[in-house]
Protein backbone atom coordinates (compact mmCIF):
# COMPACT_ATOMS: atom_id res chain seq x y z
CA UNK A 1 0.00 0.00 0.00
CA UNK A 2 3.05 2.31 -0.30
CA UNK A 3 3.19 4.71 -3.24
CA UNK A 4 5.37 3.34 -6.06
CA UNK A 5 8.07 5.56 -7.59
CA UNK A 6 10.00 4.77 -10.80
CA UNK A 7 13.47 6.31 -10.88
CA UNK A 8 15.75 6.32 -13.92
CA UNK A 9 19.44 7.11 -13.61
CA UNK A 10 21.28 8.48 -16.62
CA UNK A 11 24.74 9.91 -16.89
CA UNK A 12 28.15 9.62 -18.46
CA UNK A 13 30.13 6.38 -18.23
CA UNK A 14 32.04 5.87 -14.95
CA UNK A 15 30.41 8.83 -13.20
CA UNK A 16 28.97 6.73 -10.36
CA UNK A 17 25.40 6.03 -11.49
CA UNK A 18 25.30 2.48 -10.13
CA UNK A 19 26.92 3.51 -6.85
CA UNK A 20 24.55 6.45 -6.44
CA UNK A 21 21.40 4.49 -7.13
CA UNK A 22 21.63 2.02 -4.32
CA UNK A 23 24.83 2.62 -2.44
CA UNK A 24 26.08 -0.71 -3.74
CA UNK A 25 22.77 -2.54 -3.23
CA UNK A 26 23.85 -4.96 -5.94
CA UNK A 27 27.24 -6.49 -6.50
CA UNK A 28 29.11 -5.56 -9.68
CA UNK A 29 28.73 -9.13 -10.94
CA UNK A 30 24.93 -8.86 -10.65
CA UNK A 31 24.79 -5.61 -12.62
CA UNK A 32 27.40 -6.15 -15.34
CA UNK A 33 26.78 -9.85 -15.87
CA UNK A 34 26.95 -10.23 -19.65
CA UNK A 35 30.32 -11.47 -20.99
CA UNK A 36 30.78 -8.33 -23.12
CA UNK A 37 30.02 -6.10 -20.11
CA UNK A 38 32.63 -7.85 -18.00
CA UNK A 39 35.21 -7.91 -20.78
CA UNK A 40 34.83 -4.21 -21.53
CA UNK A 41 34.09 -3.09 -17.95
CA UNK A 42 30.95 -1.21 -18.96
CA UNK A 43 27.21 -1.50 -18.49
CA UNK A 44 25.39 -2.25 -21.74
CA UNK A 45 22.12 -3.61 -20.41
CA UNK A 46 19.94 -1.61 -18.04
CA UNK A 47 20.19 -2.65 -14.39
CA UNK A 48 17.12 -2.73 -12.14
CA UNK A 49 17.10 -2.35 -8.36
CA UNK A 50 14.05 -2.29 -6.10
CA UNK A 51 14.06 -0.96 -2.56
CA UNK A 52 11.69 0.54 -0.01
CA UNK A 53 11.71 3.26 2.58
CA UNK A 54 9.19 3.74 5.35
CA UNK A 55 7.11 5.93 3.03
CA UNK A 56 7.64 4.60 -0.53
CA UNK A 57 8.61 1.67 -2.76
CA UNK A 58 11.18 2.47 -5.47
CA UNK A 59 12.01 0.75 -8.76
CA UNK A 60 15.32 2.14 -9.95
CA UNK A 61 16.56 1.67 -13.54
CA UNK A 62 20.21 2.39 -14.25
CA UNK A 63 20.65 3.16 -17.93
CA UNK A 64 23.96 2.51 -19.66
CA UNK A 65 26.23 5.52 -19.80
CA UNK A 66 27.25 5.01 -23.41
CA UNK A 67 25.40 7.09 -25.98
CA UNK A 68 25.47 4.12 -28.36
CA UNK A 69 23.25 2.11 -26.01
CA UNK A 70 21.04 4.61 -24.20
CA UNK A 71 18.65 5.23 -27.08
CA UNK A 72 18.21 1.54 -27.96
CA UNK A 73 14.52 0.83 -27.26
CA UNK A 74 15.17 -2.90 -26.89
CA UNK A 75 16.99 -2.41 -23.60
CA UNK A 76 13.73 -2.12 -21.68
CA UNK A 77 14.15 1.51 -20.72
CA UNK A 78 10.92 2.71 -22.27
CA UNK A 79 9.79 3.97 -18.86
CA UNK A 80 12.54 6.59 -18.96
CA UNK A 81 12.67 7.21 -22.72
CA UNK A 82 10.68 10.45 -22.50
CA UNK A 83 13.05 11.68 -19.81
CA UNK A 84 16.03 10.83 -21.98
CA UNK A 85 14.54 12.73 -24.90
CA UNK A 86 13.91 15.76 -22.69
CA UNK A 87 17.45 15.66 -21.33
CA UNK A 88 18.89 15.25 -24.83
CA UNK A 89 17.17 18.43 -26.00
CA UNK A 90 18.34 20.37 -22.94
CA UNK A 91 21.91 19.13 -22.43
CA UNK A 92 24.32 19.37 -25.36
CA UNK A 93 26.63 16.53 -26.36
CA UNK A 94 29.55 16.36 -23.91
CA UNK A 95 32.62 18.13 -25.20
CA UNK A 96 35.00 15.92 -27.05
CA UNK A 97 37.79 18.46 -27.08
CA UNK A 98 38.90 21.04 -29.58
CA UNK A 99 40.78 20.32 -32.77
CA UNK A 100 43.43 22.95 -33.45
CA UNK A 101 44.35 23.44 -37.07
CA UNK A 102 46.61 25.94 -38.74
CA UNK A 103 49.78 26.38 -40.68
CA UNK A 104 53.21 25.64 -39.34
CA UNK A 105 55.83 27.24 -41.55
CA UNK A 106 58.96 25.31 -42.47
CA UNK A 107 61.16 25.00 -39.39
CA UNK A 108 58.47 26.15 -36.93
CA UNK A 109 58.05 24.09 -33.78
CA UNK A 110 55.20 23.86 -31.30
CA UNK A 111 54.54 22.25 -27.93
CA UNK A 112 51.40 20.78 -26.44
CA UNK A 113 51.23 21.48 -22.71
CA UNK A 114 48.76 20.13 -20.20
CA UNK A 115 48.42 18.70 -16.73
CA UNK A 116 48.99 14.93 -16.46
CA UNK A 117 48.19 14.33 -20.11
CA UNK A 118 49.53 11.59 -22.34
CA UNK A 119 50.83 13.30 -25.44
CA UNK A 120 51.79 11.51 -28.63
CA UNK A 121 54.15 13.50 -30.76
CA UNK A 122 54.63 13.68 -34.49
CA UNK A 123 58.30 14.19 -35.20
CA UNK A 124 57.86 15.88 -38.55
CA UNK A 125 55.36 16.99 -41.15
CA UNK A 126 55.84 17.75 -44.81
CA UNK A 127 54.31 20.31 -47.12
CA UNK A 128 50.79 19.26 -48.03
CA UNK A 129 50.22 17.21 -44.86
CA UNK A 130 46.84 17.85 -43.26
CA UNK A 131 47.46 18.03 -39.53
CA UNK A 132 45.21 18.63 -36.57
CA UNK A 133 45.70 18.32 -32.84
CA UNK A 134 42.96 17.26 -30.43
CA UNK A 135 43.61 19.53 -27.47
CA UNK A 136 41.23 18.62 -24.68
CA UNK A 137 42.80 20.10 -21.58
CA UNK A 138 45.90 21.10 -23.52
CA UNK A 139 47.29 24.27 -25.05
CA UNK A 140 49.41 24.51 -28.21
CA UNK A 141 52.21 27.08 -27.85
CA UNK A 142 55.58 28.19 -29.18
CA UNK A 143 58.26 26.11 -27.39
CA UNK A 144 59.43 27.73 -24.16
CA UNK A 145 56.83 30.52 -24.25
CA UNK A 146 54.93 29.28 -21.18
CA UNK A 147 55.49 26.75 -18.42
CA UNK A 148 52.86 24.57 -16.74
CA UNK A 149 52.58 24.82 -12.96
CA UNK A 150 51.06 22.43 -10.43
CA UNK A 151 50.87 24.91 -7.55
CA UNK A 152 49.70 28.49 -7.56
CA UNK A 153 49.00 31.09 -4.92
CA UNK A 154 45.61 32.74 -5.30
CA UNK A 155 43.11 34.88 -3.48
CA UNK A 156 39.66 33.27 -3.65
CA UNK A 157 36.24 34.69 -2.85
CA UNK A 158 33.64 32.06 -1.97
CA UNK A 159 29.99 32.91 -2.50
CA UNK A 160 27.80 32.75 0.59
CA UNK A 161 24.64 30.65 0.66
CA UNK A 162 22.60 33.81 0.07
CA UNK A 163 24.69 34.62 -3.01
CA UNK A 164 24.03 31.17 -4.48
CA UNK A 165 27.17 29.46 -3.23
CA UNK A 166 27.59 26.16 -1.39
CA UNK A 167 26.67 26.09 2.26
CA UNK A 168 28.98 23.17 3.02
CA UNK A 169 32.58 23.39 1.90
CA UNK A 170 34.43 20.58 0.20
CA UNK A 171 38.12 20.00 0.38
CA UNK A 172 40.41 17.21 -0.73
CA UNK A 173 39.89 15.29 2.52
CA UNK A 174 36.09 15.27 2.68
Curated annotation (Swiss-Prot):
Residues carrying N6-acetyllysine: 161
Coiled coil, from the record: none
One GO cellular component, as annotated: mitochondrion
InterPro entries documented for this protein: EF-Tu_GTPase (IPR050055), G_TR_CS (IPR031157), P-loop_NTPase (IPR027417), T_Tr_GTP-bd_dom (IPR000795), Transl_B-barrel_sf (IPR009000)
Residue positions where Phosphothreonine is found in the record: 103
Record PROSITE patterns: G_TR_1
Nucleotide-binding is among the record's keywords: yes
Top-level division of the source organism's lineage: Eukaryota
Compartments in which it is found: Mitochondrion
Main location: mitochondrion
Positions bound to GTP: 62-66
Keywords, ordered alphabetically: Acetylation, Elongation factor, GTP-binding, Hydrolase, Magnesium, Metal-binding, Mitochondrion, Nucleotide-binding, Phosphoprotein, Protein biosynthesis
Reactions performed catalytically: GTP + H2O = GDP + phosphate + H(+)
Single GO MF annotation: translation elongation factor activity
SUPFAM superfamilies: P-loop containing nucleoside triphosphate hydrolases (SSF52540), Translation proteins (SSF50447)
Family to which the UniProt record says this protein belongs: Belongs to the GTP-binding elongation factor family. EF-Tu/EF-1A subfamily.
Job of this protein: GTP hydrolase that promotes the GTP-dependent binding of aminoacyl-tRNA to the A-site of ribosomes during protein biosynthesis.
Protein name per the record: Elongation factor Tu, mitochondrial
Organism this protein belongs to: Mesocricetus auratus
Gene field: TUFM
Amino acid sequence: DKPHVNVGTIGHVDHGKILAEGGGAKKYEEIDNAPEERARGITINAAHVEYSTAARHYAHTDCPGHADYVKDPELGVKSVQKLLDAVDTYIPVPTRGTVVTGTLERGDECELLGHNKNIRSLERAEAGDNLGALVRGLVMVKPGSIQPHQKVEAQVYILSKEEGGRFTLRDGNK
